[in-house]
Curated annotation (Swiss-Prot):
GO terms for molecular function: rRNA binding; structural constituent of ribosome. InterPro entries: bL21-like, bL21-like_sf, Ribosomal_bL21. The keyword Ribosomal protein applies. One of its GO terms (cellular component) is ribosome. Pfam families: Ribosomal_L21p. It comes from Gluconobacter oxydans (strain 621H) (Gluconobacter suboxydans). This is Large ribosomal subunit protein bL21. The lineage of its organism: Bacteria, Pseudomonadati, Pseudomonadota, Alphaproteobacteria, Acetobacterales.
């Protein structure tokens, strides 16, 4: 069984026991999160597509860790101006383990 959920402005295809990195959620490691924005549920020859959400469907996940992605370097240079700027950014993410998909 699999589902498509929406969180952090993005859509993710999830399956039970899969590990997923999503945009930072305010939750501590070890806590359980329930996603109600389920866009699609499928598996074993059946497919339910929501319009826009599947009514009553939920996905539960456990927070594994709060992490950060590798650094992205931003470098801006203006030629012949002796002007340059270097900056770095590490995006915070939440690592989740999908526990169960409940289709209504």
């Amino acid at each position: 069984m699999y589902a498509v959920i929406r969180t952090g402005g993005k859509q993710y295809r999830v399956a039970p026991e899969s590990i997923l990195k999503v945009e930072k959620l305010e939750a501590e490691a070890g806590s359980t999160i329930t996603f109600t924005d389920v866009l699609m549920v499928g598996g074993e020859g059946t497919l339910t597509v929501g319009a826009p959400l599947v009514a009553g469907a939920t996905v539960t996940a456990t927070v594994v860790a709060q992490d950060r992605l590798p650094k992205v370097i931003i470098f801006k240079k203006r030629r012949r101006q002796n002007s340059r700027r270097k900056n770095g950014h590490r995006q915070p993410v939440t690592v989740l383990r999908i526990n169960a998909i409940n289709a209504a």
